[in-house]
């Protein structure tokens, strides 16, 4: 058999080069909107395939989770150590309306807090808000030296740690989380009011510093309610409502006259 190119085989090959299709041609961009409790509402954009047959674009967007820095949401660089998770709940036009879905600390902030010569105290508790959200709050605190203390170390005893943990749970459940809804609770996380209350309450047991709600996980959410979501977002309405136009009383609308024989 002669060695060489078989021309008949190459002629029988169907088609030429494969057509290059842009993957973004069949996709649409949607704006992500944060709840009204944050200063900056436009979080960013997200991509989804267009509606094709039974595959609806808005259904593909729902329940997506976005992680955003609190510094971007509130335009404050001092809050850059917090990461906020937002979950897409509904789509209104080209806007994706989100709801708070958790919070966490950045790794560098958490590591900067842990130091020698002090005791780290952690506690976590499950709470239920008035609007039926079940959350798990993780609290972290560190002991500090008393006023006029000469000794370098400030280690707390086991009995004191147990008392502080008990106080943490009490404040997180009774005084804070269980008496408010999710929107009000998020408003307490940002200025760290829960941490300040814990620090004040445990002053008699052992002085604390750097008391934070370091992490929030949502364990269970209630059934989706569009009206409640609209309350969280504030400037959106559940349906498009037309604007009423005032017409002067003396203005008469002329009716077109019928021309006979035209």
UniProtKB/Swiss-Prot annotation:
InterPro entries: Ribosomal_eS1, Ribosomal_eS1_CS, Ribosomal_eS1_euk. GO terms for molecular function: structural constituent of ribosome. SMART domains: Ribosomal_S3Ae. It comes from the Eukaryota. Keywords: Cytoplasm, Ribonucleoprotein, Ribosomal protein. The keyword ATP-binding does not apply. It is found in: Cytoplasm. GO terms for cellular component: cytosol; cytosolic small ribosomal subunit. GO terms for biological process: translation. The keyword NADP does not apply. Component of the small ribosomal subunit. Mature ribosomes consist of a small (40S) and a large (60S) subunit. The 40S subunit contains about 33 different proteins and 1 molecule of RNA (18S). The 60S subunit contains about 49 different proteins and 3 molecules of RNA (25S, 5.8S and 5S). Belongs to the eukaryotic ribosomal protein eS1 family. This is Small ribosomal subunit protein eS1. It comes from Brassica campestris.
């Amino acid at each position: 058999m002669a060695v060489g190119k078989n021309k008949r085989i190459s002629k029988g090959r169907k088609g030429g080069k494969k057509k290059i299709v842009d993957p973004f041609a069949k996709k649409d961009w949607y704006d992500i909107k944060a709840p009204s409790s944050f200063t900056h509402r436009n979080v960013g954009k997200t991509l989804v395939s267009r509606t094709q047959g039974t595959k609806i674009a808005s259904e593909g967007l729902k329940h997506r989770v976005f992680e955003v820095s609190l510094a971007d949401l509130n335009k404050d660089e001092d809050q850059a150590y917090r990461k906020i998770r937002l979950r897409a709940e509904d789509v209104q036009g080209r806007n994706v309306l989100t709801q708070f879905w958790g919070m966490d600390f950045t790794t560098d902030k958490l590591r900067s807090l842990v130091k020698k010569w002090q005791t780290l105290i952690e506690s976590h508790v499950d709470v239920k808000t008035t609007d039926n959200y079940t959350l798990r709050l993780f609290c972290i605190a560190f002991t500090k030296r008393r006023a006029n203390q000469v000794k370098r170390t400030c280690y707390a005893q086991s009995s004191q740690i147990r008392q502080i943990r008990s106080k943490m749970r009490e404040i997180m459940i009774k005084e804070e989380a269980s008496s408010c809804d999710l929107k009000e609770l998020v408003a307490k996380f940002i200025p760290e009011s829960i941490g300040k209350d814990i620090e004040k309450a445990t002053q008699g047991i052992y002085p604390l510093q750097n008391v934070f709600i370091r992490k929030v996980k949502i364990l269970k959410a209630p059934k989706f309610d569009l009206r409640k979501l609209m309350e969280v977002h504030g400037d959106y309405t559940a349906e498009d409502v037309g604007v009423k136009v005032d017409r002067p009383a003396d203005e008469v609308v002329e009716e077109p006259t019928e021309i006979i024989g035209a």
